[in-house]
Amino acid sequence: MNEEQIIIVDKMAKYGGSFAKTLAECFYRLDGNNFRKLRAVFPEYWKEYSEK
């Protein structure tokens, strides 16, 4: 993850509900290819936490 992505995932982990926090944990553990796949499946969460 790059610095901007880390900030967004950190926001998910800190401010999210149980599902967003679980997504954040997944993002922390994924390699680049799987990170892109998961991000594509849940774009609404990515958008929400990128705007906070």
Predicted regions span which residues?
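N-terminal acidic leader/helix
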Residues: M1-E25
